[in-house]
Amino acid sequence: MGVAVRVIPCLDVAAGRVVKGVNFQNLRDQGDPVEFARRYAEQGADELTFLDVTATVDDRSTTYDVVRATAGQVFIPLTVGGGVRSTEDVARLLGSGADKVGVNSAAIARPGLVAEIADRFGAQVLVLSLDVKRSASTDSGFAVTTHGGRTETGLDALEWAARAIELGAGELLVNSIDADGTKEGFDLELIREMRALSAVPVIASGGAGKTADFAPALRAGADAVLAASVFHSGELTIGDVKTALAAAGMEVRP
């Protein structure tokens, strides 16, 4: 028996509600995150990812409440990212019921944060999120961006991922800005390049549109696949994806 692949729905949460927008702009209310989480757990999700897209510090406490409420009702691993800037933020999220914490722009601004979190809580808690765009300006052809892909950092995505792994990142959440929202499949070259860096688990994100899109991402080297809008809209269920993966010869949890 091999290791089962993971299917992970992602919820963008702002001020305690699930929202949908394009690159964090024009956010529209989609509903209660606890209800979404319960539904996905019932469908067989292996994990859940919450991304806090709240713009203001005032609403951060609402996010902790949402995490607490979700963790009290849903018993699958929960990763929370967005706005994590310190080990204190991580401690509060873990104390609220998160199992793992995602860091992105704060780690780019201060890479030492990765080591601080890993040293205090363990690498297994730390997910490095990367929003990656194809770019001729980097050696690998892939650049790290922030602000939903609108701001280029000048960092080579593969170099940054390798450095973060050295500092203690225990997992990579790799989101293709180019593929995101296209529903035309994941960026397989990007996944292969990230897989070649190390044995650290890779979560592929960006581009899922149909059940046939998921198996190629896993064959390219991803350990898990993440999607948002196709699940929220009801176009696909977690079960649909797992059925397709099992038919493709992959081991999935029920």
Swiss-Prot record:
It holds the Pfam family His_biosynth. It is found in: Cytoplasm. It is an enzyme of class 4 (lyase). GO terms for molecular function: imidazoleglycerol-phosphate synthase activity; lyase activity. The keyword Cytoplasm applies. One of its GO terms (biological process) is L-histidine biosynthetic process. The keyword Membrane does not apply. Pathway: Amino-acid biosynthesis; L-histidine biosynthesis; L-histidine from 5-phospho-alpha-D-ribose 1-diphosphate: step 5/9. It catalyses: 5-[(5-phospho-1-deoxy-D-ribulos-1-ylimino)methylamino]-1-(5-phospho-beta-D-ribosyl)imidazole-4-carboxamide + L-glutamine = D-erythro-1-(imidazol-4-yl)glycerol 3-phosphate + 5-amino-1-(5-phospho-beta-D-ribosyl)imidazole-4-carboxamide + L-glutamate + H(+). The active site is at residues 12, 131. SUPFAM superfamilies: Ribulose-phoshate binding barrel (SSF51366). Keywords: Amino-acid biosynthesis, Cytoplasm, Histidine biosynthesis, Lyase. It comes from the Bacteria. Its EC number is 4.3.2.10. GO terms for cellular component: cytoplasm. Belongs to the HisA/HisF family. IGPS catalyzes the conversion of PRFAR and glutamine to IGP, AICAR and glutamate. The HisF subunit catalyzes the cyclization activity that produces IGP and AICAR from PRFAR using the ammonia provided by the HisH subunit. Heterodimer of HisH and HisF. HAMAP family: HisF. This is Imidazole glycerol phosphate synthase subunit HisF. It comes from Leifsonia xyli subsp. xyli (strain CTCB07).
